[in-house]
Amino acid sequence: DLAKRKEEALAPGTDRARQRQHDRGKLLARERIDLLLDPGSFHELDLLARRPSDSGYEDRPYTDGVVCGWGTVDGRKVFVFSQDFTVFGGALGEVFAAKIHKLMDLALKVGAPIIGLNDGAGARIQEGVVSLDSYGGIFYRNVQASGVVPQISVIMGPCAGGAVYSPAMTDFVFMVEDTSYMFITVPDVVKTVTGEEVTQQELGGAIAHAAKSGVCHFTSADDASCLEDVRYLLSFLPSNNLEEPPVVPTDDPVDRLCPELRDIIPPSSNQPYDMAKVIEAVVDDGEYYEYAQRWAPNVVCAFARLGGHVVGIVGNQPMHLAGVLDIESSEKAARFVRTCDAFNIPLISFVDVPGFLPGVDQEHGGIIRHGAKLLYAFCEATVPRIQV
C-alpha cells in the first residue's frame, strides 16, 4: 500500500494537465528539480502530505501541489520547493504552505540556500482566509532568512496577487521569457479599474520586470536555460553568511597587466566607452555575471572573480546617460552592495560619474532619498572595498 501511495504521489496531476504543461513549453515540477540539482541528490520531504480526511474536501492529492526537499548543486547543499501547476493550478493552500514553512525553517537551521520554483495561481480561494494567512508565514521566514542564507526565486509560470511578495523579498529573482509573469492584479482587473488594456506579458512579463520595474534580475529563454543560470549564480555565493564564497582555481595570473585598457578608455572625458569591456579585461578569464542588466543600465553590477576569489563589481556605464546616477541606478547599486556585504563578497567600484542626474522628475521622485540608499549601503558595508 505504501509503494502504491508513493507511486501515486510522484504523478498526482492528470495526464492531460501534464501534457498541457509541456505544450506551453514548460517543464513539470519534478523535471525542473532534476535539472537544477546534481543527479541523484534530491531527498524529498513530505511526499505523502495532503489535506486531512476531515477537511471536507473530496479532492486530496498527495504533495498538495508542491514538491519540497533538499539536494546539492556542485556538491553543496540547497533546499528547494517546486510548485506543481498540474495540481490545483499550483495554488497555495494550508498543507502546501506548511511544507514550505518546514523547508525554510530547515534551510535556516542548516545554513543552506533556499530556491523557490514558482508556477502557481496564487492563493487557493476554496480554503478561504486560511490560505491567505499561510502567506504570512512565508513572508516572515523570508525576512528571518534575509542576509543569512541566499534566497532565490525562479518565476516559471504565473505568479499573481499575494504570491508576488515573497519573491520580491528574496535576494535574486529569475524569470523565463514568454511563459512567466508577475503582477498584483490581472489585466482584466486593470482594465475594469483604470480602462487600460494590456496583455499579461506587457503588464508583468519577464522583459517588463527586467527593464522597467527592476523586480527581475535575470531572464532566460526557457526553463532549462533558466535553471542552468541559477546553478551558475550559486557558484558565486556562499551557503550562508558565516561562510566565504567558493574559490575556483584559475590559470589567469593575478599580477598580469591590462594594456588593452589604454584602447578601451578614451583620452577625452567627453567620449563614452563601454564599462563592460573594462570589467571583462580585468576579471579572471574575462568572465562575469551581470546583475539586473536590463534595468538602470547606467550602472553595471556584476559578480566576477579575481585570483579565483569572488568579487562584486559596481561600475558607472558611460554608454548610458554618461554613467550618471539617478533614482533607479542608485536603488539597483544599493541593493547589490548590501547583498554582497551580507554574503562576504568584497566590492570593487569602477568610478567614472559626473554626479547625480538633475531634473524636476528626479527631485520630485526622491533622488535625495534614493541616492542616500547607495551612500548608506557603502558606509554600512564591512567587506573589503576598493575604488578604481
Task: Give the ranges of each region predicted by the language model.
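Ligand-binding clefts of soluble mixed alpha/beta catalytic domains
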Residues: D1-V388
